UniProtKB/Swiss-Prot annotation:
Protein name per its UniProtKB record: Putative pre-16S rRNA nuclease
GO cellular component: cytosol
Swiss-Prot/TrEMBL keywords: Cytoplasm, Hydrolase, Nuclease, Ribosome biogenesis
Role description: Could be a nuclease involved in processing of the 5'-end of pre-16S rRNA.
Gene3D superfamilies with a match to the protein in the record: YqgF/RNase H-like domain
Length: 151
């Protein structure tokens, strides 16, 4: 099994994959979206097919009080669109997707802060830091889901 973690950002969508044993998440990159995360759907579908992803974990950016704001509603719309596009991709031979994976939204409060701390702890700063935050946030989101799945 392989899980995919997704952090929806305004400039980039960060991606992370699990190992087949579902113990560790690792970054696989970003997709530039230039303010429109819906532009990333086809590339995410390609990753799902190419990596034979069984489960997708999407960060749900709740407000600190636990309520859903504008960004959380956007993440929900994005996940619904991903699922619809995946169903269509399964029928379309030009995609390598053979089945629709489970899609899960998880609370991502403070994951960006955690990602920043992890990058600083790894002595990654300056220009290298900014583009890595989204994929590191995806790692935090996915690792949290992986750890929770073993409880």
């Amino acid at each position: 099994m392989v899980w995919l973690g997704i952090d929806l950002g305004d400039a980039r969508v960060g991606l992370a994959l699990s190992d087949p044993e579902l113990t560790l998440a690792h970054p696989i990159g970003n997709i530039q979206v230039y303010g429109d995360s819906f532009r990333a759907l086809d590339e995410v579908i390609d990753v799902i097919g190419d990596e034979s992803v069984d489960h997708v974990v999407i960060g749900l950016p709740l407000l600190l009080n636990g309520e859903e704001g504008k960004s959380a509603k956007k993440a929900r719309r994005w996940s619904v669109n991903l699922e619809k596009r995946l169903h269509a991709a399964v029928e379309d031979e030009s995609y390598s997707v053979t089945r629709v994976p489970t899609i899960e939204l998880v609370d991502e409060r403070l994951t960006t802060v955690t990602a920043h701390h992890q990058l600083f702890d790894a002595r990654i700063g300056g220009r290298k830091h900014r583009p890595m935050v989204d994929q590191q946030s995806a790692v935090v989101i996915l690792q949290t889901a992986l750890d929770r799945s073993r409880e």
